[in-house]
Amino acid sequence: MNIIDSFEQKNIAKLTANKNIPDFEAGDTVKVTVKIIDRSIEKDGKEKLTERFQAYEGVVIAKRNRGITSSFLVRKISHGEGVERRFMTYSPIVHSIDVVKYGVVRRAKLYYLRNRSGKSARIKERHIPIAKNQAVKA
């Protein structure tokens, strides 16, 4: 491991210390919570910063693993239009990543979903068995 790799590993460890980044891949439906900082100017001229969180849920169509510059592309349909947004995996703006559904696909990049709509754009769901310690007792 060279100096650059060790530097990246230290920074990744620092950025993920208070975050849990799950294992996900292309085809999975994720919910990404993003921190948004709004800036407004009050009547007396002072600047006011407000912080809020916004959720973005969609299908991961591409994932790029490149150390600290890793990113993933999420696609969703909003008001009948396809919207894609790229998130940096280790960015401080990304508050949390939750996997909603696991999908079954045979490709690493799902760019073909851009040309499809309706039933042909659906992805089969992969069922993950619940671990024994997480099982709900009835």
Curated annotation (Swiss-Prot):
GO terms for molecular function: structural constituent of ribosome. Keywords: Ribonucleoprotein, Ribosomal protein. The keyword Transcription regulation does not apply. InterPro entries: Ribosomal_bL19 (IPR001857), Ribosomal_bL19_CS (IPR018257), Ribosomal_bL19_sf (IPR038657), Translation_prot_SH3-like_sf (IPR008991). It comes from the Bacteria. The keyword Manganese does not apply. GO terms for biological process: translation. GO terms for cellular component: cytosolic large ribosomal subunit. HAMAP family: Ribosomal_bL19. This protein is located at the 30S-50S ribosomal subunit interface and may play a role in the structure and function of the aminoacyl-tRNA binding site. PANTHER family: LARGE RIBOSOMAL SUBUNIT PROTEIN BL19M, RIBOSOMAL PROTEIN L19. Belongs to the bacterial ribosomal protein bL19 family. NCBIfam families: rplS_bact (TIGR01024). This is Large ribosomal subunit protein bL19.
